[in-house]
Amino acid sequence: MRQEAEPATDEIDEVAPGILRMQLPLRMPGLGHVNCYALEDERGMTIVDPGMPGPQAWKLLIERFSLAGFQLKHVHTVVVTHSHIDHFGASGRIRQKANANVVTSSTFRTWWDPTDVGEVELEGETQQPDPREPWKMSTPWGGKHPRPPRRVRLKYRFLRPMMRRWFATPSPSVRLADAERITLGKREWVSVHTPGHTPDHLCLFDPEGGVLLSGDHVLPTITPHISGIDAGADPLTDFFASLDKVSDLPGVTRVLPAHGHPFDDLTARVKDIHRHHEERLAKLTEAAERLGEAPVEELSKHLFRQRSWGPMADSETYAHLEHLRLGGKASRREEEGRLLYSVK
Protein backbone atom coordinates (compact mmCIF):
# COMPACT_ATOMS: atom_id res chain seq x y z
CA MET A 1 0.00 0.00 0.00
CA ARG A 2 1.31 3.42 -0.93
CA GLN A 3 1.62 5.78 2.00
CA GLU A 4 -0.98 8.20 0.63
CA ALA A 5 -3.55 5.37 0.84
CA GLU A 6 -2.77 4.48 4.45
CA PRO A 7 -5.75 4.96 6.78
CA ALA A 8 -5.67 7.90 9.16
CA THR A 9 -4.40 7.40 12.69
CA ASP A 10 -5.07 9.59 15.72
CA GLU A 11 -1.34 10.10 16.30
CA ILE A 12 -0.22 13.74 16.50
CA ASP A 13 3.27 14.30 15.05
CA GLU A 14 5.54 17.32 15.31
CA VAL A 15 6.81 17.19 11.73
CA ALA A 16 8.84 20.41 11.91
CA PRO A 17 9.57 22.71 14.85
CA GLY A 18 6.24 24.14 15.98
CA ILE A 19 4.22 22.35 13.26
CA LEU A 20 1.88 19.48 14.19
CA ARG A 21 0.35 16.97 11.78
CA MET A 22 -3.15 15.59 12.35
CA GLN A 23 -4.40 12.85 10.00
CA LEU A 24 -8.07 13.01 9.03
CA PRO A 25 -9.93 10.04 7.47
CA LEU A 26 -10.61 10.16 3.74
CA ARG A 27 -12.09 7.78 1.20
CA MET A 28 -11.06 8.78 -2.30
CA PRO A 29 -9.35 6.77 -5.03
CA GLY A 30 -5.81 6.07 -3.77
CA LEU A 31 -6.20 8.24 -0.65
CA GLY A 32 -6.85 7.13 2.93
CA HIS A 33 -6.24 10.36 4.81
CA VAL A 34 -5.56 14.07 4.49
CA ASN A 35 -2.88 15.78 6.57
CA CYS A 36 -4.15 18.77 8.53
CA TYR A 37 -1.27 20.86 9.86
CA ALA A 38 -1.45 23.07 12.96
CA LEU A 39 0.89 26.01 13.61
CA GLU A 40 0.88 27.79 16.97
CA ASP A 41 1.67 31.44 17.68
CA GLU A 42 0.87 33.96 20.40
CA ARG A 43 -2.65 34.50 18.96
CA GLY A 44 -3.58 30.84 18.81
CA MET A 45 -3.58 28.34 15.96
CA THR A 46 -3.38 28.30 12.17
CA ILE A 47 -4.85 25.20 10.50
CA VAL A 48 -3.88 24.03 7.00
CA ASP A 49 -6.42 21.94 5.01
CA PRO A 50 -9.02 20.91 7.63
CA GLY A 51 -10.53 18.03 5.66
CA MET A 52 -14.02 16.98 4.64
CA PRO A 53 -17.42 18.49 5.51
CA GLY A 54 -20.22 16.69 7.31
CA PRO A 55 -21.06 15.87 10.97
CA GLN A 56 -18.86 12.78 11.30
CA ALA A 57 -15.83 14.48 9.75
CA TRP A 58 -16.40 17.53 11.97
CA LYS A 59 -16.54 15.37 15.11
CA LEU A 60 -13.23 13.72 14.22
CA LEU A 61 -11.62 17.09 13.44
CA ILE A 62 -12.59 18.49 16.86
CA GLU A 63 -11.25 15.31 18.49
CA ARG A 64 -7.93 15.78 16.68
CA PHE A 65 -7.77 19.37 17.92
CA SER A 66 -8.17 18.09 21.48
CA LEU A 67 -5.47 15.45 21.03
CA ALA A 68 -3.16 18.18 19.71
CA GLY A 69 -3.80 20.26 22.83
CA PHE A 70 -6.07 23.05 21.60
CA GLN A 71 -9.73 23.82 20.97
CA LEU A 72 -11.75 25.21 18.10
CA LYS A 73 -11.89 28.63 19.77
CA HIS A 74 -8.10 28.90 19.49
CA VAL A 75 -8.12 28.72 15.67
CA HIS A 76 -7.66 32.18 14.14
CA THR A 77 -6.65 31.22 10.57
CA VAL A 78 -7.43 28.43 8.12
CA VAL A 79 -5.20 27.98 5.06
CA VAL A 80 -6.81 26.17 2.11
CA THR A 81 -4.26 24.99 -0.44
CA HIS A 82 -6.79 24.50 -3.25
CA SER A 83 -10.45 24.09 -4.13
CA HIS A 84 -10.90 20.35 -3.59
CA ILE A 85 -13.41 19.17 -1.03
CA ASP A 86 -10.94 17.18 1.10
CA HIS A 87 -8.98 20.40 1.67
CA PHE A 88 -11.58 23.14 2.06
CA GLY A 89 -14.48 21.02 3.38
CA ALA A 90 -14.47 22.09 7.04
CA SER A 91 -13.04 25.58 6.51
CA GLY A 92 -16.36 27.40 6.24
CA ARG A 93 -17.64 25.91 9.46
CA ILE A 94 -14.40 26.78 11.29
CA ARG A 95 -14.73 30.32 10.02
CA GLN A 96 -18.31 30.51 11.24
CA LYS A 97 -17.71 28.91 14.65
CA ALA A 98 -14.31 30.45 15.51
CA ASN A 99 -14.50 33.69 13.48
CA ALA A 100 -11.31 32.55 11.75
CA ASN A 101 -9.78 34.03 8.61
CA VAL A 102 -9.63 31.82 5.51
CA VAL A 103 -6.42 32.18 3.48
CA THR A 104 -6.20 31.00 -0.15
CA SER A 105 -4.37 31.86 -3.33
CA SER A 106 -5.60 34.94 -5.18
CA THR A 107 -6.85 32.61 -7.93
CA PHE A 108 -8.99 30.48 -5.60
CA ARG A 109 -12.16 29.17 -7.25
CA THR A 110 -15.28 30.01 -5.28
CA TRP A 111 -17.04 27.01 -6.79
CA TRP A 112 -16.17 23.34 -6.74
CA ASP A 113 -16.17 20.96 -9.69
CA PRO A 114 -16.56 17.39 -8.37
CA THR A 115 -15.53 15.91 -11.72
CA ASP A 116 -11.98 16.86 -10.71
CA VAL A 117 -11.88 14.09 -8.12
CA GLY A 118 -14.61 11.59 -8.95
CA GLU A 119 -16.31 9.74 -6.11
CA VAL A 120 -15.83 10.49 -2.43
CA GLU A 121 -17.24 8.71 0.59
CA LEU A 122 -19.36 11.05 2.65
CA GLU A 123 -20.65 9.87 6.04
CA GLY A 124 -20.32 6.23 4.98
CA GLU A 125 -22.02 6.64 1.60
CA THR A 126 -20.02 6.78 -1.62
CA GLN A 127 -21.46 9.54 -3.78
CA GLN A 128 -20.78 12.06 -6.51
CA PRO A 129 -21.31 15.16 -4.30
CA ASP A 130 -22.38 17.78 -6.78
CA PRO A 131 -25.46 20.00 -6.26
CA ARG A 132 -26.10 19.47 -9.96
CA GLU A 133 -26.53 16.04 -11.53
CA PRO A 134 -23.09 15.08 -12.90
CA TRP A 135 -24.41 12.27 -15.09
CA LYS A 136 -26.16 14.93 -17.19
CA MET A 137 -22.98 16.94 -17.74
CA SER A 138 -20.93 16.70 -20.93
CA THR A 139 -17.15 16.52 -20.91
CA PRO A 140 -14.88 18.74 -23.05
CA TRP A 141 -14.04 15.71 -25.20
CA GLY A 142 -17.70 14.92 -25.88
CA GLY A 143 -18.26 12.07 -23.46
CA LYS A 144 -20.81 11.68 -20.70
CA HIS A 145 -20.33 10.87 -17.05
CA PRO A 146 -21.66 7.41 -16.09
CA ARG A 147 -25.36 7.31 -15.23
CA PRO A 148 -25.76 5.78 -11.75
CA PRO A 149 -28.54 3.35 -10.75
CA ARG A 150 -32.00 4.80 -10.14
CA ARG A 151 -31.79 4.40 -6.35
CA VAL A 152 -28.56 6.43 -6.31
CA ARG A 153 -30.11 9.17 -8.47
CA LEU A 154 -33.15 9.42 -6.17
CA LYS A 155 -31.01 9.53 -3.04
CA TYR A 156 -28.78 12.10 -4.66
CA ARG A 157 -31.72 14.40 -5.40
CA PHE A 158 -33.05 13.94 -1.86
CA LEU A 159 -29.69 14.91 -0.32
CA ARG A 160 -29.01 17.77 -2.74
CA PRO A 161 -30.07 20.64 -0.40
CA MET A 162 -27.78 19.32 2.33
CA MET A 163 -24.94 18.73 -0.11
CA ARG A 164 -25.27 22.24 -1.49
CA ARG A 165 -24.47 23.54 1.99
CA TRP A 166 -21.73 21.03 2.81
CA PHE A 167 -19.89 21.42 -0.47
CA ALA A 168 -19.98 25.20 -0.71
CA THR A 169 -16.47 26.64 -1.03
CA PRO A 170 -15.48 29.22 1.59
CA SER A 171 -15.25 32.92 0.86
CA PRO A 172 -11.57 33.79 1.41
CA SER A 173 -10.68 36.51 3.91
CA VAL A 174 -7.14 36.77 2.53
CA ARG A 175 -6.19 36.01 -1.08
CA LEU A 176 -2.43 35.69 -1.45
CA ALA A 177 -0.76 36.88 -4.64
CA ASP A 178 2.19 34.87 -5.90
CA ALA A 179 5.34 35.65 -3.86
CA GLU A 180 3.33 37.54 -1.24
CA ARG A 181 4.50 37.07 2.35
CA ILE A 182 2.38 36.15 5.37
CA THR A 183 3.30 35.41 8.99
CA LEU A 184 1.69 32.28 10.44
CA GLY A 185 2.81 30.16 13.37
CA LYS A 186 5.85 32.33 14.16
CA ARG A 187 7.19 31.80 10.63
CA GLU A 188 7.21 34.10 7.63
CA TRP A 189 5.86 32.21 4.63
CA VAL A 190 6.10 33.02 0.95
CA SER A 191 3.08 32.27 -1.22
CA VAL A 192 3.94 30.05 -4.19
CA HIS A 193 1.24 29.71 -6.85
CA THR A 194 1.45 26.21 -8.32
CA PRO A 195 -1.28 25.63 -10.94
CA GLY A 196 -1.57 22.17 -12.46
CA HIS A 197 -3.45 19.84 -10.13
CA THR A 198 -5.94 22.70 -9.92
CA PRO A 199 -5.65 26.20 -11.41
CA ASP A 200 -5.71 27.74 -7.91
CA HIS A 201 -3.20 25.55 -6.06
CA LEU A 202 -1.13 27.25 -3.35
CA CYS A 203 2.07 26.16 -1.62
CA LEU A 204 3.65 28.02 1.29
CA PHE A 205 7.43 28.23 1.71
CA ASP A 206 9.35 29.26 4.82
CA PRO A 207 12.79 30.36 3.51
CA GLU A 208 14.35 30.64 6.96
CA GLY A 209 13.23 27.23 8.18
CA GLY A 210 13.41 25.45 4.81
CA VAL A 211 9.84 24.13 5.13
CA LEU A 212 7.47 23.75 2.17
CA LEU A 213 3.75 23.13 2.71
CA SER A 214 3.18 21.41 -0.62
CA GLY A 215 -0.53 20.55 -0.53
CA ASP A 216 -1.29 18.11 -3.35
CA HIS A 217 1.30 19.62 -5.68
CA VAL A 218 4.18 17.37 -4.64
CA LEU A 219 3.25 14.10 -2.93
CA PRO A 220 5.76 11.50 -1.69
CA THR A 221 4.90 8.43 -3.82
CA ILE A 222 2.02 9.29 -6.17
CA THR A 223 1.33 12.14 -8.56
CA PRO A 224 -1.74 14.36 -8.18
CA HIS A 225 -4.58 14.01 -10.64
CA ILE A 226 -4.09 16.36 -13.61
CA SER A 227 -7.60 17.05 -14.79
CA GLY A 228 -8.47 18.14 -18.31
CA ILE A 229 -11.91 19.41 -17.34
CA ASP A 230 -11.35 23.00 -18.44
CA ALA A 231 -11.61 23.04 -22.23
CA GLY A 232 -8.76 24.82 -23.99
CA ALA A 233 -6.39 24.68 -21.01
CA ASP A 234 -3.06 22.86 -20.76
CA PRO A 235 -2.83 21.89 -17.08
CA LEU A 236 0.07 19.50 -17.68
CA THR A 237 2.29 22.31 -18.99
CA ASP A 238 1.21 24.39 -15.99
CA PHE A 239 2.04 21.48 -13.68
CA PHE A 240 5.51 20.99 -15.17
CA ALA A 241 6.26 24.70 -14.76
CA SER A 242 5.01 24.62 -11.18
CA LEU A 243 7.18 21.59 -10.39
CA ASP A 244 10.24 23.45 -11.66
CA LYS A 245 9.18 26.50 -9.67
CA VAL A 246 9.18 24.70 -6.32
CA SER A 247 12.31 22.74 -7.22
CA ASP A 248 14.11 26.06 -7.70
CA LEU A 249 13.17 27.32 -4.24
CA PRO A 250 16.41 27.76 -2.28
CA GLY A 251 17.07 25.65 0.80
CA VAL A 252 14.01 23.40 1.02
CA THR A 253 14.87 20.72 3.59
CA ARG A 254 11.40 19.58 4.70
CA VAL A 255 8.30 18.98 2.57
CA LEU A 256 4.92 18.68 4.26
CA PRO A 257 2.42 17.13 1.80
CA ALA A 258 -1.35 16.92 2.11
CA HIS A 259 -1.27 13.11 1.79
CA GLY A 260 1.44 10.67 2.81
CA HIS A 261 4.37 11.38 5.09
CA PRO A 262 6.75 14.35 5.22
CA PHE A 263 9.94 13.97 3.21
CA ASP A 264 13.19 15.84 2.65
CA ASP A 265 14.51 15.49 -0.92
CA LEU A 266 12.27 17.76 -2.97
CA THR A 267 14.57 17.88 -6.01
CA ALA A 268 14.65 14.10 -6.40
CA ARG A 269 10.89 13.82 -6.03
CA VAL A 270 10.26 16.52 -8.65
CA LYS A 271 12.53 14.64 -11.07
CA ASP A 272 10.59 11.42 -10.43
CA ILE A 273 7.26 13.12 -11.13
CA HIS A 274 8.58 14.69 -14.34
CA ARG A 275 9.84 11.28 -15.45
CA HIS A 276 6.50 9.64 -14.67
CA HIS A 277 4.55 12.04 -16.88
CA GLU A 278 7.08 11.89 -19.70
CA GLU A 279 6.73 8.10 -19.66
CA ARG A 280 2.94 8.42 -19.79
CA LEU A 281 3.15 10.82 -22.71
CA ALA A 282 5.37 8.33 -24.54
CA LYS A 283 2.98 5.47 -23.74
CA LEU A 284 0.02 7.51 -24.96
CA THR A 285 1.84 8.40 -28.17
CA GLU A 286 2.61 4.73 -28.83
CA ALA A 287 -1.03 3.77 -28.25
CA ALA A 288 -2.25 6.51 -30.59
CA GLU A 289 0.17 5.36 -33.29
CA ARG A 290 -1.23 1.81 -33.05
CA LEU A 291 -4.89 2.83 -32.93
CA GLY A 292 -4.79 5.62 -35.46
CA GLU A 293 -7.59 8.10 -34.85
CA ALA A 294 -9.32 7.38 -31.52
CA PRO A 295 -11.54 9.00 -28.86
CA VAL A 296 -10.32 9.86 -25.38
CA GLU A 297 -12.08 6.94 -23.71
CA GLU A 298 -10.35 4.40 -25.96
CA LEU A 299 -6.91 5.94 -25.50
CA SER A 300 -7.50 6.09 -21.75
CA LYS A 301 -7.78 2.31 -21.61
CA HIS A 302 -4.23 2.05 -22.96
CA LEU A 303 -2.89 4.49 -20.38
CA PHE A 304 -4.60 3.16 -17.23
CA ARG A 305 -5.26 -0.26 -15.75
CA GLN A 306 -8.83 -1.54 -15.96
CA ARG A 307 -9.51 -0.93 -12.26
CA SER A 308 -8.89 2.80 -12.89
CA TRP A 309 -11.08 3.21 -16.00
CA GLY A 310 -13.66 5.94 -15.70
CA PRO A 311 -14.09 9.73 -15.57
CA MET A 312 -10.88 10.50 -13.69
CA ALA A 313 -8.75 8.41 -16.04
CA ASP A 314 -10.49 9.95 -19.06
CA SER A 315 -9.93 13.52 -17.84
CA GLU A 316 -6.24 12.90 -17.20
CA THR A 317 -5.87 11.26 -20.62
CA TYR A 318 -7.54 14.30 -22.17
CA ALA A 319 -5.09 16.59 -20.35
CA HIS A 320 -2.14 14.61 -21.73
CA LEU A 321 -3.60 14.59 -25.25
CA GLU A 322 -4.14 18.33 -25.15
CA HIS A 323 -0.55 18.77 -23.98
CA LEU A 324 0.61 16.80 -27.03
CA ARG A 325 -1.72 18.72 -29.34
CA LEU A 326 -0.74 22.16 -28.08
CA GLY A 327 2.89 21.10 -28.40
CA GLY A 328 2.35 20.25 -32.06
CA LYS A 329 2.66 16.47 -31.56
CA ALA A 330 -1.00 15.51 -32.00
CA SER A 331 -4.12 16.69 -33.78
CA ARG A 332 -7.82 16.32 -33.21
CA ARG A 333 -11.09 16.66 -35.03
CA GLU A 334 -14.72 16.53 -33.97
CA GLU A 335 -17.12 13.87 -35.19
CA GLU A 336 -20.71 13.70 -33.96
CA GLY A 337 -19.86 15.71 -30.86
CA ARG A 338 -16.81 13.66 -29.87
CA LEU A 339 -13.15 14.56 -30.21
CA LEU A 340 -10.93 12.12 -32.08
CA TYR A 341 -7.14 12.33 -31.60
CA SER A 342 -4.21 11.20 -33.71
CA VAL A 343 -0.48 11.75 -33.35
CA LYS A 344 1.70 13.43 -35.95
Predicted regions mapped to residue ranges:
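C-terminal regulatory/interaction regions
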Residues: 1-6, 283-344
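Conserved beta-strand hairpin/beta-sheet module of binuclear metal-dependent hydrolase folds
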Residues: 10-70, 74, 203-214, 220
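Residues at alpha-helix caps and immediate loop-helix transition turns in enzyme cores, especially N-
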Residues: 35, 57-60, 90, 269, ...
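Metallo-beta-lactamase
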Residues: 45-46, 52-54, 151-174, 181, ...
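Active-site HxH/HxHxD metal-binding segment of metal-dependent hydrolases
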Residues: 56-58, 64-183, 210
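Aromatic/hydrophobic pocket-lining residues that form the small-molecule binding cavity
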Residues: 61, 239, 317
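Histidine-centered divalent metal-coordination motifs
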Residues: 79-87, 105, 195-197, 201, ...
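Short hydrophobic/aromatic-enriched beta-strand-loop microsegments
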Residues: 99-105, 213-215, 273, 309
